[in-house]
């Protein structure tokens, strides 16, 4: 895309290239086409809400002088100098085109040129003030620039093709890195191209951008690339709105506000900053009802996340590290609060922000030293004071502190005293006294009362309520109060549970570290004891050879018993057992006979050939005194459970399956339900498809001539030096001193990555005398070449800076696996669940090769859900969960007992081992570098001094972690023996991943069972309610008929008299009064007197 100014250099000369000239006829045709296009171009009309000068100045910038400047409603990123630079210098260009254009045509083309450059009114003003000759020259240059590519029409067509390429790319369903590259390119195009290009793109492109944003927001698990794409989409929307057409399209799309509100995320401060800025602009320049639409979008987005609607904005203000986000949030608050015309609504919005946490944060925000933030805070305070002043004028100039409860009460009292509303106000206060004095319930009551009052006072229609309505408002809020109270209790309990869990993790970590330290000391004690024993032996040998008695035995170490006694001498006449006799000749290849069977068990005999189970009725000799499992004979053919059966040869003495007693769960009712739900049916399998995506990333290289460094290295060093902006000597001294206050991980990583090799640094050192003649990257190389052993030094410093991070990454993983192993072995509810599953499986597998199983592999638990019921409406997992809820509710506690299984499932033993090995290798390299490090020649060089103490600490921390890791692996190996699986082939991540998946599936099955029961109960109640309503309808018709036909048996006179008598006596309303019983316990004498005085019927519930 060529800008008009960029192409002018080729078209602004005094002559044209041969063959490039145009005849007068063709020039006239082009002028006519341009004039027609200018006349027929649709005008973009958008109603922009203007503000008074003082209000607008308060929001956009604080007034520092009394001179009022007219500012544009939509700010553009084009500076006046930049705008002028886009137009080429005015050159005398008087060809046939400029001479033949009329003054009106020149002015029309001049306006079109400025609009195509996306200039706002402030940037257009100085250009309009130029003389007519300059305007004519600029127009001719603009025509030449566009005509160079085939005329105005063809240039526009090329822009359309370019924008349609982006539309096609977005419509093709790209994602991840490819989408990120596309969005970045689109953002640049939306920023640099003229409005016509944005117009062509916006017809389809805006909807595609919103579709992509909605797709990313609906994604449950968002990766880092998804967050980057969201940010790029917001930037594209912001660029798209940077003109009247784009703003009009955004305001015209119903989804835009909701998606922008949903995308507000305090965890992504940069993206949230852009969003709240966009919403602030929309709030100011939008149509009259834009505030209602915006608040509706914010409310809908908050309801999706079950939170207060303004809490994300307040959380953005809490981010102390993102100052721009705080400024943007305060700006958005000011835009929202100052937009309504009604004073009541402004006060309501401001109070809602203050209740959400803004009130406690304002003092801290005012202490920050930032001009932009101070402006927004002053705007907030000034508007607040103005509203209070307006309110005081409304209240006859009575000044009050609205934030003080006592002042507000006295203000209300003075307003209502000696008026007809006084008694109603007194009745309201008396009702407040009836609220139960409970720590949890009282705040919830006032919360609901405040919501009701705000809805009544701030009615959306802007009209007063219907004061003629005299019927009692029968509203039962008991269930709402209870839910609010329960929610408050649950939140408090969850907070306490989180605190206790954190304390427990800290205590457990300290215990593991103490055990590791104790184990290390025990090993040291054993080594010392061995050395003492060896010294004693040597002393005895020396004393026996020289005849000098050896030294007396040293006393045992504290806490250590005496050394073990020497072995007893052989019995008299005894001798060690002789070796077994050699085999007889001729029997070398024959194996010895098998040993006799052990008295107390032992390995079972091998199974028959081919793994065929023995015929029924023949019992096997099971190890460790186990009994044969019961053979079940269901009355119907059951579905089979395809589990991995544990063979008797796999059992160990301490395994879980030896003490299983699943027969205690036997129940005829359970077997009957199994037979009913899991009779044999044909399974239906579904195929799944997988999609693959290719990622491409174009790279561009920038070539630059240098003396020694290659261009790429020089460019990287230039970027690095430009980002840090520190003197080269200061960078060198910070590295020599190992100054951690100045050093950062990013700084060292960039140096390690971008510095050239030592050989090139040595070559640069030779150019020290030509320092001033070198470019900046090579000057930096000259300075850094004076540091000895630079690369090992940087690697060691980087290891020191990241050591604490490595510890914090490794230690929680070890603790999580250790806790998960202990929880799994101690969980009684999980053991009972395994017993129940074993019983159900053996019953369903009766008559198959998996019948009478002693146990099953743990990974089978995730496959329970694959077994469908006969009607395909439920699964075996839902059935087991239902049985547990009905009869064995203690089993339902196992997900809580296995709390750390989820975190353990994310631990990779291989990565953990690799990280520990890498840490040890770095410590060894650091120790070696310190030993061979040359003596410091620079007074700033403190590398050896600081790294020596760090090496000692790092070694101690590593040994402690290594011991904890070994203990963790031993626990996992013991767990493999306990549940009969190979801990060497089944990884930690796989084992605990299966358990965590089963835990999640079980909880989901419990929720689905509860939902199913609720639906069944709801259907049953609806059916009963329908029958009851029909019955009541028949009764009312019957009573009405009786009332009318009272004189049916007599003559036809007196029907109306009877109706009037029934109405007068209340017989016609007797049933209605019975449906609204009054509670005599809630009656209060003052309330009754107040109600009787004003004919009020206020329920004192």
UniProtKB/Swiss-Prot annotation:
Record-linked SMART domains: Drf_FH3, Drf_GBD, FH2
UniProt entry keywords in alphabetical sequence: Acetylation, Coiled coil, Cytoplasm, Developmental protein, Differentiation, Endosome, Oogenesis, Premature ovarian failure, Repeat
Tissue expression summary: Expressed in testis, ovary, small intestine, prostate, lung, liver, kidney and leukocytes.
InterPro entries given in the database record: ARM-like, ARM-type_fold, DAD_dom, DIA_GBD_sf, FH2_Formin, FH2_Formin_sf, FH3_dom, Formin_Homology_Diaphanous_sf
Chain residue ranges for the region called Disordered: 1-44, 536-594, 1010-1048, 1070-1101
Domain GBD/FH3: 98-464
Amino acid composition bias (Basic and acidic residues), ranges on this chain: 1010-1035, 1078-1090
UniProt free text on domains: The DAD domain regulates activation via by an autoinhibitory interaction with the GBD/FH3 domain. This autoinhibition is released upon competitive binding of an activated GTPase. The release of DAD allows the FH2 domain to then nucleate and elongate nonbranched actin filaments.
Protein name: Protein diaphanous homolog 2
